[in-house]
Amino acid sequence: MSLKEFADALPDYAKDIRLNVGSLLGDQTLTEQRKYGLLLACAHGSGYKPIVEATEAEVAGKLSPEAANAARAAAAVMAMNNVYYRFVHLASNKEYGQMPAKLRMNVIGSPGIEKDDFELFSLAVSAMNGCGLCIDSHEKVLRQHGVAADVIQTAARVGAVIKAAATVHATAV
């Protein structure tokens, strides 16, 4: 099942989500690696296997093995980092922010693809997971690399739409 077929199976009350998935698939503003990498990272970031499977089918042959692995790695490391750094950010005791994280995250330094694309995937998953500290960190790096605000906004939209599609599909009555 493709991502389009997945979206087409959403109930009528989620018509807007279905249309938004179609808009993302038809997006011409992002590079292919960014578009399909974002979709894959966000699908994995949702933690919902049916949308992961549909997105894996959608991106097959459209992403290099390195880019697909980087998208999956972004989702994996953000699953860890977003929880930890959201804790650091929200805890009243600021001492935690001064302590070393002691978490392995080597993939951030060596993702196997362009740094800005990996940061974009990480930002989208961080938006899905609600980690403000991570969003700010990734957005800052992206802007330093010259990534335009509309590209960053698109990444956040991908996260929002994929999260909504996964949630609706998982809870449809």
From Swiss-Prot:
InterPro entries: AhpD, AhpD-like, AhpD_core, CMD-like. Keywords: Antioxidant, Disulfide bond, Oxidoreductase, Peroxidase, Redox-active center. NCBIfam families: ahpD, ahpD_dom. HAMAP family: AhpD (MF_01676). It comes from Rhizorhabdus wittichii (strain DSM 6014 / CCUG 31198 / JCM 15750 / NBRC 105917 / EY 4224 / RW1) (Sphingomonas wittichii). Belongs to the AhpD family. Its EC number is 1.11.1.28. One of its GO terms (biological process) is response to oxidative stress. It catalyses: N(6)-[(R)-dihydrolipoyl]-L-lysyl-[lipoyl-carrier protein] + a hydroperoxide = N(6)-[(R)-lipoyl]-L-lysyl-[lipoyl-carrier protein] + an alcohol + H2O. GO terms for molecular function: alkyl hydroperoxide reductase activity; disulfide oxidoreductase activity; hydroperoxide reductase activity; peroxiredoxin activity. The active site is at C131, C134. The keyword Transmembrane does not apply. Antioxidant protein with alkyl hydroperoxidase activity. Required for the reduction of the AhpC active site cysteine residues and for the regeneration of the AhpC enzyme activity. This is Alkyl hydroperoxide reductase AhpD. Disulfide bonds join C131-C134.
